[in-house]
Structure formats: C-alpha cells, structure tokens
Amino acid sequence: MKRGKDEEKILEPMFPRLHVNDADKGGPRAPPRNKMALYEQLSIPSQRFGDHGTMNSRSNNTSTLVHPGPSSQPCGVERNLSVQHLDSSAANQATEKFVSQMSFMENVRSSAQHDQRKMVREEEDFAVPVYINSRRSQSHGRTKSGIEKEKHTPMVAPSSHHSIRFQEVNQTGSKQNVCLATCSKPEVRDQVKANARSGGFVISLDVSVTEEIDLEKSASSHDRVNDYNASLRQESRNRLYRDGGKTRLKDTDNGAESHLATENHSQEGHGSPEDIDNDREYSKSRACASLQQINEEASDDVSDDSMVDSISSIDVSPDDVVGILGQKRFWRARKAIANQQRVFAVQLFELHRLIKVQKLIAASPDLLLDEISFLGKVSAKSYPVKKLLPSEFLVKPPLPHVVVKQRGDSEKTDQHKMESSAENVVGRLSNQGHHQQSNYMPFANNPPASPAPNGYCFPPQPPPSGNHQQWLIPVMSPSEGLIYKPHPGMAHTGHYGGYYGHYMPTPMVMPQYHPGMGFPPPGNGYFPPYGMMPTIMNPYCSSQQQQQQQPNEQMNQFGHPGNLQNTQQQQQRSDNEPAPQQQQQPTKSYPRARKSRQGSTGSSPSGPQGISGSKSFRPFAAVDEDSNINNAPEQTMTTTTTTTRTTVTQTTRDGGGVTRVIKVVPHNAKLASENAARIFQSIQEERKRYDSSKP
C-alpha cells in the first residue's frame, strides 16, 4: 500500500491538540516533533505486528508499553495505552469527550464487518491502540439479517488511576461481555452505558488537560483500517489460539486484575466457512474454562455446555437424588432413615438420662436421706390404679386403708412389660402378723458387730394392738441366724413411701448388686448409719419364712397396677412348707449400685434354687392391728439374689415369677457411663423379648 496516501489520511487525526472546540483556545497548535515516526509506525504493518508478536509470546499474555516522558512533547503529553496494559495516569478529563465522539463511532460501527483488534506500539513516545469489534459471527446459527441487527460496542473508557473497561454490548441480546478492566468513576460508567445503547464505537485516548484530538476529522482513517482487515483478523486468530481464548490484563496502578475471556467464533464473525467451523469446535472445547472467566451474560451455548461440569456435590438437591434412585426407592429409603433417626433419638435420650441420674445419685447419696420423712407422707390416692405410671418417677406406697381394685387375671402383667426396664427395683409387699417375728433374720436395735447386717428396711406399720407402732428389726442370732424382733417405733402413718427412679431420692446407700426396697423414717437409733437389711438370702432361715397368704396389695416399687391384688388374711404356713406358686412380676427395675457390707454373700443361693419361692424370705413384717380388724391385708416382701446376678423373686399365692435387676448406682460417678451402657443394653434386650412375645 502507498505510504503517501496513508500519510494524507492519517496526518490530520494525529494532531493531538487539534479539536473542534479549540477555537476558544486560540486555534490549532503545532504538531509534536516526532509525528513522522508515528506515521511510519501506523503505516507499516510489518513493523507494527513484528513487535507485537514478540510481546504476545510471553507466558503471562501481557505486555507493557514504553512510557513516554513529557519532555518529548511540547505540552507534556503523556500516553500509555495498550491492549493488555493500560496506564491511565493522566486521563481525568477524557470522559468529557464521549459525546463529541459519537458521530465518529457511528461511522466506524457501520463499516466494520469483521472481528479484529489492532495494536500499535511506538518505541519512542506513543502507543495508539485501535479497537475494532464487529458483529457476531454466524457460528451461533444466526441468520445474516439477524446479524445485521446486532450491535457490539467495545469501549475504552479511561479515567485517572483507574482501569479501562472494554465491553462488548449486543443490543439485541448479545450473549457475551468481555471485560478488560473496570471503570470506577460513576460518570464514566454512565457514559459507557449510554454509548453501549447507542451502538457506537468509542476510542478514548489518555491525553493531558491541554491536548485534545478532533475525532470527527479522523473518519478518513477508516479506509486504512479496511486495508488491514485480513492481516488483523489473522493476527487476532493466532493470538487467541496462543492465549487459549483468554487474555489477562493487569492494571498496575490500581492493583486490579480483570480477564478477557473471548471466543474465536465470536471474535471472527464473517470469516471463511472453514474458519467458522474451526472457531466453533475450539469454542466448544474451551467452554468449561471460559464459563469461569466471562460474566453472567455469557453466550447460551457456552453456559449450556458447562452447566453440568460446574455442578458441585454441595448443589445436589433432593430432586436429583429422586431422579437417580427413583421415586419408590427414594421414599423407601427416606422412610427407613426417618425411622432410624427416631429410634436413635429415643435411645440417646434414655442413655443420657441414665447417665445423669447415676451421676446425681452417686455424687450425693447421703443428702437424699433428708427427704425420707416426706416419703411416708405420700398419699396413695395420688396415684391412679389403672394407669401405667412411668417407673422412673413414682413408687406407689401401699396402704392398708386404701381399697385397691382386685386383679383377677394376669393380663396386666403383660401390659406392664411394655414399660419394663432394668432401671427399676422389683419388690413385693404383703402383710403378716406380728407374731411371725421369730422367723426372720438380722438387723436389731443396735448394729451388729459383723458386717453382714446391711440390708433393707421399710417404714413401720401400726402395731396389732394399742395405739403405738411396732418395728420388726432383723437381728442376726447366733443360734437361729437372721431373725426379726419387735421394736417399738415412733409414731408414723405407716406408709410405704419412696420414690425410685430417675431424679428421685434414695434414702440410704444400699449394698452393691441389690435393689432398694424401702426405708424407715429417720431418727431411729437402732439402725446403723447406712444400715439396710441384707437381700442375700440365708439358707438357714429360708425354711422359716414361708407363709400362706393372699396379699391385698401387690405392687412393685413403681406403683404399676398389674402388681396389685385384693386378698384376705391367712395364717402362716409351716416353716418348711415352700410357697406353692410363683408369679413373675415383669416390672421396670431401677437398680442402684451400692457398697456391699454383707458377709453372707457366699451363702446366697445361685441359679434356679436362689430364685425359688422356698428360698425367699421376708425382710420384715409390721402389722397394723387397727387396720386388720376387718380382715385387713397382710403384706410380705420376698426377695432373693444370686451371686452371679442381682435377682428379685416375688412370691405370691396366685402365681410366681422372677424379675432380674441390674445395679445402677456405681461406687463413684466415674463409672456412671459404663453402667449406663450396660443398663441401656439390658433395656434393649428386654424390649426385644417383649416384642417377640407379642401374639
């Protein structure tokens, strides 16, 4: 191409101070002294692209232009413009020239038909970039008429100490925005938006306050631009392939980094069919990477190709799971998971409750003695007979004057099993005459010297005659073994009171492996500090304990109605006569671990013999004469334990059975978790047995 023709076309636009509004400033001024070098740089493509190809071969895809010194220009003109690096150190006033440049933008936009980008580097002083971006290509399947309606407006909007924004706007629904940098000034952004709506083409140069360019006279430069379309398009394609479809730009002034994520098929719209096909294939291969670089208005095809790859595991919704598993399997699995969570929540609650109760009881067993006096005052009327009460909270004190509905069948025993657990203590209470005292064993007025007399005692019953009360105290006799002797007790209502279970007071520290049955009111000097009647059975006196009876009230320590019966008083059987029947009383048992002070553990029976009725005994018996005038019931508690496990045997005339209990209260609070695990396992096993026994 001819240099003279190009010089004539380029000469006028390159006067930087020439502007249409310079009339008030004294007219045009002298051009810069090195304008001829600029003309040569703009006119010779080989020189321009040779230097630029070297710069683009860098690994970081960036290039920095030479910063001219103000001494090389008459008025201190300083420019720093590049495609990849733009230094806007003196461009505060450049935003005022957008309106005056609209006519030139329309001319360039209407004539530009291809995606191209022209970069110029001036080795000495200047760097004048020219951005030309055409309409979208036909690679997206748009018709030629549709392409004519598309408008792309790449803009370079400089501002002082800010980045430059390169934005491609498509008014009819452009699918791509390429952002080189951001304009931080509001007025710059507003002007950029206005230019984008108008579909114009903006070229803004960084100039000093005293230097302006008359862009209206530079329309003739468009002919020169058309001459370089082919070479620019080829260079742009090569550069985009080298950069992987992306160009990074760094603004060193602001420290901000922006990305130029472009696609070949969108940058080179009207190339040959081969180019379009190549661009389409390349864009699809780079779709996933480009999705992370472009903004939210990226093209639909890129977004569709990359949507599946960009989904992370955190974004999976229940609908996705349903689609994979199927609706039936999903609901079946969901139901199973919900049931397991529900069961686990109940089990966890029970386990935590056991641990908490054990720690409370183990930490302060002696403090619970202060509340014994109110235990005997609990009214049995406050506990409904036919209601299954939680064994963790209540112990119904059987009273002779309370009329209890007779139980004629054993179905309530099964009904009680549902609530049964190893947390509760099982005991049987029955009345007996005070004349049977000689058949019972240890624990007299004064604590015996031997460690054996450590067992359970119950509150007194009113004596058979007179207005005073009488206690039957177990005493270890050297000739007879464990016997009971009468002892006058203080006035008392005679209630078998006591709360057994979670968060309830234990009156005394009881022997290990044996459940507590009942406690007398405090203040009796004939009881040892932590004295209880031993639950370990003495074989010597086991033959002296049997009594034929039909108890009026039979209930466990937790007041379940399945253990209550109305019976009539009967005479004592012979010493060697075994109990005819045993009835199993499946109850919730809340055992407590205690330090054993019994010396007769070795004599305790084990196995079935230890739990038979013939081996059972009554810890004590107290008779209320006033309440027995009209065939008042007698109550007997028969318990036995084995050396291998703690067992409570309940002996009645109408049935028999055995309920095993496990110790709960540890010696110290550190063992609470270990014991709770064992109790929890026992609860689960008991529930399994109950479920298997269901019809």
From Swiss-Prot:
UniProt protein name: Protein EARLY FLOWERING 3
Compositionally skewed regions (Low complexity) per UniProt: 598-616, 636-653
Key words of the record: Biological rhythms, Nucleus, Phytochrome signaling pathway, Transcription, Transcription regulation
Basic and acidic residues bias (residue ranges): 1-11, 216-226, 234-253, 260-283
BP term (GO), one: entrainment of circadian clock
Record flagged with keyword Transcription regulation: yes
Domain of life: Eukaryota
PANTHER family per the UniProt record, alphabetical: PROTEIN EARLY FLOWERING 3
Stretch list, region Interaction with ELF3: 261-484
Record's GO cellular component terms: nucleus; transcription regulator complex
Complexes and interactors: Interacts specifically with both Pr and Pfr forms of phytochrome B. Interacts with ELF4. May form a homodimer.
Compartment(s) where it occurs, according to its Swiss-Prot or TrEMBL record: Nucleus
GO MF term (any one): DNA-binding transcription factor activity
Role description: May be a transcription factor part of a circadian clock input pathway. Acts within a 'zeitnehmer' feedback loop and is involved in its own circadian regulation. Has no role in regulating circadian clock function in the dark. Part of a corepressor complex consisting of ELF4, ELF3, and LUX involved in the transcriptional regulation of APRR9. The activity of the protein may be decreased in long day conditions due to its interaction with phytochrome B (phyB). Can regulate the initiation of flowering independently of phyB.
Comp. bias regions, Polar residues: 54-74, 551-567, 579-588
Region (Disordered): 1-33, 48-75, 136-159, 216-283, 541-653
